[in-house]
Structures are given as C-alpha cells and as structure tokens.
A protein has these predicted regions:
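Short glycine/proline-centered loop/turn elements that form peptide/ligand docking sites
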Residues: 133
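Secretory targeting and sorting signals
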Residues: 1-31
Length: 218
C-alpha cells in the first residue's frame, strides 16, 4: 500500500541529509567460491531485479550511460523495464563497489515498481547478472527531490546520501516516483520528463554473491 508523505520516519532519510548509510563494520559480503565481485567498467549487458516483499520478480534492467531519470533513461522506463545509468554521472554495475542505480515507473508503462514502497528495512533485493546473483539487504528509505540539486547529488553519490565520500562497499538505490503522495499533498509540479518532484528511494547493501541456478529443463 503506498506510503503517505512524510514517509516512515524510522526508515526515511530527509531530503538534504548528508548521512552516509553504512553496513555493520564487521560484516563483509559473504561470497561463494566461484563468483567474484565484478570489476570496474560498464555493465556487460541487461540484468534482472527481484524484490520478493514488493512482488517484483525478474524485472529486466537496461544499463545506459547517463544519470537517473534523464531523457534516455525515461525512454527506457517507458518500455516497461527498469533503467540503470552508469558512467561519470551514473552509478556502477551489479556487485561493484559504489552505488548501483535502478529506476523504473510506478504508475505508467505497466507500473513495474508499483509496490516498491512496500519494501522495508531488512528485506532482500536480488540482482542477477552474468550468471551471478547479488543479494542486497535494504537498509534505509530516502526521499529525493527533483527540485534540489543537493538532493539529486545525494541520490546519485557513490555512497548514497554522502556526495564526495569514497565508496568502500557495494550498495544499491532503487528509485520510483512519489506521484500519488505528491498529488495527495497538492504538489503537482513535474519536470520536462514528467517526473514529479519527489521519488522514493530504497537503499541496500550487498550481503552475498552466489551462482545463479541453472534453468530447469522441460
């Protein structure tokens, strides 16, 4: 069920906050012997996103060079899939140290992230790429404002919420619009791409990697 604004205080990071989100210091991501954390560089290709607690399973994610919710990214989202920007103004690939950015529509194009707000702290996020499953744990929710350059910098930072801080772990930001909440509050602002002012961001930390299961033969 969509969360009213303001979002849950225990999970939300206020717009403009500079707080870094860190996993417990002693817990490095557990790994099976075979898969390794991906090396630097552009993602090899499309991958999938699953968030069981939000009913999201096998959502196709298309990497592209750019930044969150720019025109190329919005065009990808309009296809009913998710977009993942990389490069100088984007994020990193699955399993890499830094911030894996994923955005998709909540209401239009089939609403693939319609129930993203239902995901809570402690819930599992599965990213499958190149035969490897990267398991992230949601650790926080934050609100991004498209009308605040600072807020956008915090969303896109290598360490979510802390622009300029060097990343030391693999993290993920999954973002979708807060259109219902904005409209309920009387806020009908939108940008050139039709994005409302606010977005709901779920932030996670990589906990383990494992081999993807081989498909069952029919």
């Amino acid at each position: 069920m969509p969360l009213p604004l303001p979002f849950r205080a225990a999970a939300a990071l206020a717009v403009g906050a500079v707080t870094a989100l860190a996993a417990p210091a002693a817990s490095a991501p557990a790994q099976d012997r075979s898969p390794a954390t991906a090396s630097a560089g552009a993602p090899a290709g499309a991958f999938t996103l699953s968030i069981p607690s939000a009913g999201i399973a096998g959502l196709r994610v298309m990497p592209y060079e750019g930044t969150t919710d720019d025109r190329p990214g919005t065009r990808i989202q309009d296809l009913g899939v998710a977009a993942s920007p990389y490069g100088e103004r984007g994020g990193v690939g699955p399993g890499r140290v830094g911030n894996l950015l994923i955005t998709a529509h909540r209401l239009s194009a089939g609403g693939p992230l319609h129930d993203l707000p239902a995901a809570d702290e402690g819930d599992t996020v599965l990213v499958t790429a190149g035969g490897v499953v990267y398991t992230y744990e949601i650790v926080a929710t934050r609100t991004t404002s498209f009308r605040s350059a600072r807020s956008l910098s915090e969303q896109r930072a290598a360490v979510p919420g802390a622009p300029g801080k060097a990343a030391t772990q693999a993290m993920i930001t999954i973002s979708t619009c807060a259109t219902p909440e904005d409209h309920a509050a009387g806020n009908h602002w939108s940008d050139a791409q039709g994005n409302p002012e606010h977005r709901i961001d779920k932030i996670g930390v990589l906990r383990k990697t494992s081999k993807a299961s081989a498909p069952q033969g029919g």
